[in-house]
From Swiss-Prot:
Phosphorolytic 3'-5' exoribonuclease that plays an important role in tRNA 3'-end maturation. Removes nucleotide residues following the 3'-CCA terminus of tRNAs; can also add nucleotides to the ends of RNA molecules by using nucleoside diphosphates as substrates, but this may not be physiologically important. Probably plays a role in initiation of 16S rRNA degradation (leading to ribosome degradation) during starvation. Homohexameric ring arranged as a trimer of dimers. GO terms for molecular function: 3'-5'-RNA exonuclease activity; tRNA binding; tRNA nucleotidyltransferase activity. InterPro entries: ExoRNase_PH_dom1 (IPR001247), ExoRNase_PH_dom2 (IPR015847), ExoRNase_PH_dom2_sf (IPR036345), PNPase/RNase_PH_dom_sf (IPR027408), Ribosomal_Su5_D2-typ_SF (IPR020568), RNase_PH (IPR050080), RNase_PH_bac-type (IPR002381), RNase_PH_CS (IPR018336). CDD domains: RNase_PH_bact. GO terms for biological process: rRNA catabolic process; rRNA processing; tRNA processing. Phosphate binds at residues 86, 124-126. Its EC number is 2.7.7.56. Keywords: Nucleotidyltransferase, RNA-binding, rRNA processing, Transferase, tRNA processing, tRNA-binding. The keyword Lipid metabolism does not apply. This is Ribonuclease PH.
Length: 258
């Protein structure tokens, strides 16, 4: 039994509040245990230079934390006059993950910018940002579709993420901060609703892990993500039927330009 009385294969309580911010084209508040992230989606008609004239869109993300999202105050990136390496790595991950679930041609020549702001951190902020970012991205796409700006709904797959790790020799799902800080192995998994992997990030902290342990972590993460996608589906309700209306084989894959 873990410190919060969960079993090793149990997710923290998840709550997603859709349309959390009034002015954004898409938004949500995602809560995974004590981790809370606000994500907004903004539609911008200016595409990156490598997409100009292509007829294709793009998804990008920014990530930051409130100074007191953690137990000790963190200095804002803007006060350091540069983006921290951690924030840069995380926002690239969020963008890559969500681009895997969209048809750029169907989106048209525009960008959806996802701003992920952590208001309380207790582990898994990047995976929560991806899972909640999908909902915000969905609602931005739905606005374009409902307003008849685009002809076809561009999201091809559900996308969600979760952390897994090994603590005290035990493989665990959805680590809180205390577990993450003492884990001998720490991994982040991103998958779609077809059971396909989008990204696997894994690190052994000062040791090594076996293939058997790796496969156990993958299976734990897969089961967790399936449950998270069911929560996403429930949050979207009937709207979720729009997903996959563009055939997957028409999807244009994107490179990681950011």
């Amino acid at each position: 039994m873990r410190q919060d009385q969960r079993s090793y294969n149990e997710l923290r309580p998840i709550k997603i509040t859709r349309n959390f911010i009034k002015y954004a084209e898409g938004s949500c508040l995602i809560e995974m245990g004590n981790t809370k992230v606000i994500i907004t989606a903004t539609i911008d008609d200016k595409v990156p230079p490598f997409k100009k004239g292509s007829g294709e869109g793009w998804i990008t993300a920014e990530y930051s934390m409130l100074p007191r999202a953690t137990q000790q105050r963190n200095v804002r990136d803007i006060n350091k006059l540069r983006l921290s390496g951690r924030s840069h790595e995380i926002q690239r991950l969020i963008g890559r993950a969500l681009r895997a679930g969209i048809n750029f041609k169907a989106l048209g020549e525009r960008v959806i910018i996802l701003d992920c702001d952590v208001i309380q951190a207790d582990g898994g902020t990047r995976t929560a940002s991806i899972t909640g970012g999908f909902i915000a991205m969905f609602d931005a796409c739905k606005k374009l579709y409902d307003d008849k700006v685009i002809e076809n709904f561009p999201i091809t797959d559900f996308v969600a993420a979760v952390s897994v790790g090994i603590c005290d020799g035990v493989e665990m799902l959805d680590l809180c901060f205390e577990e993450d800080s003492k884990a001998s192995v720490d991994m982040n998994l991103v998958m779609n609703d077809k059971g396909e992997f989008i990204e696997i990030q894994g690190t052994a902290e000062g040791g090594a892990f076996t293939q058997e342990q790796f496969e156990k972590l993958l299976e734990l993460g897969k089961q967790g993500i399936q449950k998270i996608i069911e929560i996403q589906r429930e949050v979207l309700g009937e709207d979720s039927k729009l997903i996959g209306s563009v055939p997957k084989d028409e999807k244009t894959s994107g490179c990681d330009q950011e």
